[in-house]
Amino acid sequence: DQAVPIYSNLKIGDDCYVGRDCIFDLMGKINIGNKVTISHRAVLNTHTNAGKSPVAHNALTKSIGNIKINDGAYLGSNVTVLESVVIGRNTIIGARSLVNKGIPGDVTAFGVPCKVREDNK
C-alpha cells in the first residue's frame, strides 16, 4: 500500500488527479486507489446529517460510512458520492451524478441516482 497519508481519514494512491474545488468530508474514511481521476467540484460525503426538525424538535437521522474509489476510476465534474459507497475498478461516473450506492468495476454509470448504463469490458 503506497498511499501517501495526508489526513488520518484520507488515503490517495499514486498517479491520481483531483480537480479544483472538490470537497472531501472526512468524518468517515475515504480511500482513493491508484490512477483515479476526480474532476472539478466533486463532493465525497462520508456522512449524512439531516439536522433537527423544527416541527418535531428532535434530531433527525445521522449516518457515517466510508467511501472507497478503486484503481482507475474516473469521476466526472460535479459528481456527489454519498457515505458507504464503493466505486469499482476502471469505472466511469458521468458528470453531475449522485452516487448513493455501490457501483461495480468496469462499467459506465451516470444519473440521479447513478445507475450502470454500459459494460466497459
In which residue ranges do the predicted regions lie?
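Acidic, glycine-centered active-site loop in nucleotide-sugar glycosyltransferases
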Residues: P104-G105, F110-P113
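Residues that flank catalytic or metal-binding motifs in active/ligand-binding sites
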Residues: H40, A95, G105
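Catalytic-loop signature of eukaryotic-like protein kinases
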Residues: G72, N90, V107
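Beta-rich strand-turn-strand
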Residues: S77-I92, S97-K101
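Flexible, glycine/small-residue-enriched loop-and-beta-strand segment within the central core
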Residues: D1-I12, Y17-V86, V112-P113, D119-K121
